[in-house]
């Protein structure tokens, strides 16, 4: 909301003249604000994502989106899929949205090819397209969206790999499991690549250490993650660490706690500060987490769509970061997490 400031009136202007000037300025400001409000009221923005409503991370993105739409007076709709990571359902949602011709479409481009057709249709209809949370890594989709707002996944994964590796035991063999939660999807593959980069640095720095790295399809359903990683731990009780590409390692933390495994015996690291993760960090079961500020990923695309329509500014890329969070920081973050803003 814009708040008009009192205009500066030179002291030499008389009272009556000052009142006239103030009235004129106030009238002009009212006129500008009325135009802005009218323009904002007509702004129609839709966010389609690849997540289901059960995905707690995405509730923070939605909150940012809703808050931004309220601030600029836009009509906003946030569209989830029924099954987490379902590209087919996301494409269907996008096609339905594009047919209605909103002013802007915000979406997560988890695949480099699946969305080309619907994005071309959106461009032909003059719809502003901004990718958020996940971007295409190659191909025509990059030219069909105007900006990306989200995390740079490979560097973020590398950071996680290096930071958790710094906690590995100083002696003895190292056995690591990397969970790729959605094989083939950009966010999971790029983060996993980054984690592998970080682990390779550890191996090069410790050429005399025996380092074993395994990868599995860990999935995104918490129960499935628990079952698959749990089965792996049964077969490999010497596992040093588990890396997750989302927040789904919270299921592994709970599993370890239920099995009475001491905190820190199996090191855990992943992404996103959902409340369950923070609780397990505080309990000592998760050692390193990488934040990507989901509230910002919902909020900023709306602002960019608003600025394009009402000011003529082109949308711009925004890196929402890769902040490293450790258990000693949990208390200071917990309040924002409970509000859904972190």
Residues covered by each model-derived region:
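Hydrophobic alpha-helical segments within soluble ligand-binding/sensing domains
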Residues: 90, 148-175, 225, 273-277, ...
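Extracytoplasmic "Venus flytrap"
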Residues: 44-64, 68-72, 77-94, 100, ...
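Hydrophobic alpha-helical
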Residues: 100-124, 195, 214-280
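Hinge/cleft segment of the Venus flytrap/periplasmic-binding protein
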Residues: 41, 179-183, 187, 199-202, ...
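Short beta-strand elements in bilobed, periplasmic/extracellular small-molecule ligand-binding domains
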Residues: 71-83, 177-178, 199-221
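Short, solvent-exposed amphipathic alpha-helices that sit
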Residues: 56-72, 156-160, 186-209, 228, ...
């Amino acid at each position: 909301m814009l708040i008009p400031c009192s205009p500066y009136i030179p002291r030499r202007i008389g009272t009556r003249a000052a009142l006239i000037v103030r009235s004129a300025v106030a009238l002009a400001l009212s006129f500008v604000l009325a135009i802005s409000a009218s323009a904002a009221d007509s702004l129609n923005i839709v966010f389609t994502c690849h997540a289901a409503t059960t995905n707690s991370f995405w509730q923070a993105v939605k909150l940012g989106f809703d808050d931004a739409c309220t601030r600029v007076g836009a009509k906003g709709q946030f569209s989830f899929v029924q099954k987490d990571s379902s590209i087919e359902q996301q494409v269907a949602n996008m096609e339905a949205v594009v047919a209605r011709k909103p002013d802007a479409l915000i979406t997560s481009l988890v695949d480099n090819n699946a969305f080309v057709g619907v994005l071309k249709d959106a461009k032909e209809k003059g719809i502003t397209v901004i990718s958020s949370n996940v971007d295409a890594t190659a191909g025509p989709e990059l030219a069909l969206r105007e900006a990306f707002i989200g995390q740079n996944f490979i560097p973020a994964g590398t950071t996680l790999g290096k930071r958790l590796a710094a906690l590995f035991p100083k002696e003895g063999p190292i056995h690591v499991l990397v969970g790729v939660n959605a094989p083939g999807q950009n966010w999971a593959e790029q983060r996993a690549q980054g984690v592998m980069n970080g682990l390779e640095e550890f191996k090069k720095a410790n050429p005399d250490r025996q380092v074993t790295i395994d990868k599995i399809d860990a999935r995104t359903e918490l129960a499935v993650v628990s079952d698959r990683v749990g089965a792996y731990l049964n077969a490999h009780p010497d596992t040093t660490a588990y890396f997750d590409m989302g927040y789904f390692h919270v299921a592994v933390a709970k599993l370890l706690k239920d099995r009475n495994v001491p905190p820190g015996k199996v090191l855990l690291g992943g992404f996103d500060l959902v409340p369950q993760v923070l609780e397990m960090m505080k309990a000592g079961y998760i050692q390193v987490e990488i934040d990507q500020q989901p509230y910002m990923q919902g909020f900023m695309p709306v602002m960019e769509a608003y600025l394009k329509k009402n000011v003529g500014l082109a949308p711009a890329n925004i890196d929402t970061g890769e902040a490293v969070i450790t258990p000693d920081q949990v208390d200071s973050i917990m309040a924002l997490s409970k509000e859904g803003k972190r």
